[in-house]
Design a protein with these regions (language model features):
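Juxtamembrane inter-helical linkers in multi-pass membrane proteins
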Residues: 8-34, 113-137
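Extended, low-charge hydrophobic alpha-helical regions
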Residues: 21, 42-54, 161-302
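Hydrophobic alpha-helical transmembrane segments
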Residues: 31, 86-94, 266, 295-300
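Membrane-embedded alpha-helical segments of transport systems
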Residues: 35-40, 59-74, 91-100, 220-226, ...
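Transmembrane helix-loop junctions at the membrane interface of multipass transporters and ion channels
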Residues: 67-88, 283-288
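Transmembrane alpha-helices and their membrane-interface boundaries in multi-pass membrane transporters
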Residues: 90, 94-117
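Long hydrophobic segments that form regular secondary structure
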Residues: 126-168
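Conserved small/polar residues in nucleotide/adenosyl-binding loops
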Residues: 306-313
């Protein structure tokens, strides 16, 4: 679409609508790019001449559901909302867009009241993208994703596994632990201690320490949320035949209550949509906005935005 010249015309067509929410026509392209990844989308705001419109576009971009959140949605929607999968999936995307629009209007009203920059944009001619250029873009995007998967995500997954596996009780070297002992070992692991320390902050939302720990790992990359849940719910080799979706919906052997219910799952997905952006996004916000205060603002605003009552209390 970029090579064909359509994206520039899309920005021109959307200018009137974008102005109604306090943005610029050129803000449309970075927001659309945010559905792929927020980091290049934030960097794409460099084309916006207006300082205020550029800042608003940068700050609302993390509310756009990037592709890294899709595995989380697929896992929970497929497990708890199979009959309404399309409705819930689309609803999450629309909710993120609505939050972004409301945030943009609030920022335009209270922080950035003046924007007199006219819309000036060169419209390139329509042209048919060549196969060579298309495959080059595909290769570059695939290479970036594989580097991310094989680099940050792989290393982080190994670290998460190590922190959840150690320290080991002496009995584990002599025999296979019982389900109760496995739960106790995970609870006393390094990762368990970290998760339990943070759990009181999100416990009203219905999240236990395993869920909280997956959210903490998601600050490095949202792809890590599902892999962390997979590590924490892999209690023994005998469980390898049981899928993660089955494990999270089964009753907890200690409490007798499932860690995830439909309401907790919905709350979790909305929380993932709104909470702390990945570290790469925060760095991109600070770099493109020109100050770390905007990176800190993004973290605080996104974390404080989710104030719904606990699903277990409804």
């Amino acid at each position: 679409m970029e090579d064909s010249g359509y994206m520039a015309r899309a920005a021109f067509i959307m200018d009137k609508i974008m102005h109604k929410i306090g943005l610029h026509g050129k803000s449309f392209i970075p927001l659309v790019m945010g559905f792929g990844c927020n980091v290049p989308a934030i960097m794409a705001t460099r084309t916006i001449e207006s300082r205020s419109s550029r800042l608003i576009t940068i700050l609302i971009n993390p509310f756009i559901s990037c592709s890294a959140r899709i595995p989380i949605y697929i896992l929970l929607v497929g497990t708890f909302f199979p009959q309404y999968a399309s409705l819930v999936f689309i609803g999450l995307y629309l909710f993120g867009i609505i939050v972004a629009v409301i945030t943009a209007k609030l920022m335009r009203r209270f922080f950035f009241k003046v924007d007199e920059t006219p819309f000036v944009m060169e419209l390139p001619p329509y042209r048919m993208p060549t196969a060579k250029a298309t495959f080059r873009h595909m290769w570059n995007k695939a290479e970036q994703y594989l580097r991310k998967m094989g680099g940050v995500i792989l290393v982080a997954s190994v670290i998460v596994w190590f922190l959840s596996y150690y320290p080991r009780p002496k009995a584990s070297y002599e025999r296979e632990l019982t389900p109760h002992e496995q739960m106790e070992q995970q609870s006393n692991s390094y990762l368990g201690k970290i998760g339990q320390a943070v759990t009181p902050l999100v416990e009203p939302l219905g999240f236990n320490w395993k869920v909280t720990t997956s959210l903490l790992s998601g600050t490095a990359a949202k792809e890590l949320v599902v892999s962390t849940l997979g590590v924490l719910y892999s209690e023994s080799d005998a469980d390898e035949t049981i899928s993660l979706s089955q494990k999270i919906s089964q009753p907890n052997p200690v409490t007798g209550i499932p860690d995830f219910t439909p309401l907790v799952a919905l709350s979790f997905m909305v929380f993932v949509l709104l909470y702390f952006p990945c570290i790469a996004s925060v760095i991109a916000v600070a770099k493109e906005a020109g100050s770390w205060k905007w990176g800190a603002f993004t973290v605080l605003y996104n974390c404080l935005l989710y104030t719904s009552p606990s699903p277990r209390d409804t």
